[in-house]
């Protein structure tokens, strides 16, 4: 599969894509509205950052207890059901006078539900397109996410200014419900990829199996930690520029879009393989300039250039998919998503804490420096893994009896 037109001619790709697009727009609009609401109520950079990214902390609970559900639930019902629950939760958060602690309780509950939702969605995408089409399909989803964020943050900023954060939350809830309806009507019923009931024991066994490969382990860490630390920088946009945060979010999304187009469509596989680490360094380096507290114009340029580096995720994902056993696609990709979102939540909390003690600009600089340090630490391990297994597809040693996940190959 080599062209975008082939993707959209593939049955079920379009409804899955449209549902994800609506859900991303809803998340973007609601995140900005909720952060504005919390900042106005508390004047706290920490709570503001946590309102946008803190729910991701629930992902660590889901990744260690519920992730086996990613291959054991019917995909259509799960994708549409999660979007519906997010719509209801967003309506609840728009209730006037709702205490901040109740808002955070709802956010954490939704984060727990989403902990296996990513695995269901990406496992379904891998099933629809098969491995040879996964990178191109994922790049389209990433580009869509960038465009939806550009539109969502720009529209969200206007809506919050013209209407109110609570009205904006209600509009976002409508987008979530539209996403649920699109998935319900557009996807066909499929049996779960695995038999048996989800369980904590299955989740732990499969996580251990995936982490048994040093190369997979390094790839997971590269997908989780450097990117997550930079998301900690992004979580401080509202605190750094309260009235212009939408501008920074929109330019960051535009940079991410450019990075995904370049990585997924323009680079050859050979060149792409060499740019994983440089892109991760690019992702963090421009944020070091925030130590100078630049104005909104320079800040927007910095976040645009930095966000091109998010193209590194596609490069690492391509390598990870080649190393995933066929019978673990949903769980393995869900582990990637859950770990990524968990690290985003942890980083938002860390960045918010540093900003409370110092300033948002200082915190952004510290998080960027930490991201660069982690990338440089992990890079040698990835190069050693590549030298030991150059350009190969994964050959999995069968798991011992009792520990093999009972998953049917897609």
What are the residue ranges of the model-derived segments?
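Hydrophobic core of transmembrane alpha-helices in multi-pass small-molecule transporters
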Residues: 21, 89, 100-116, 297-311
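C-terminal transmembrane bundle of multi-pass solute transporters/carriers
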Residues: 51, 55-71, 76-85, 92, ...
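Transmembrane alpha-helix termini and helix-breaking/packing motifs in multi-pass membrane transporters
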Residues: 32-41, 93-96, 151-171, 239-244, ...
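Juxtamembrane intracellular "pre-TM" segments in multi-pass secondary transporters
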Residues: 1-13, 188-221, 396-403
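A single, central transmembrane helix in multi-pass transporters
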Residues: 21, 25, 29-33, 163-170, ...
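Helix-loop junctions on the cytosolic side of multi-pass membrane transporters
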Residues: 127, 169, 173-198, 379-392
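Cytoplasmic helix-loop-helix junction between adjacent transmembrane helices
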Residues: 107-147, 153
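Loop-to-transmembrane helix entry/capping segments in MFS-fold secondary transporters
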Residues: 45-46, 131-141, 326-336
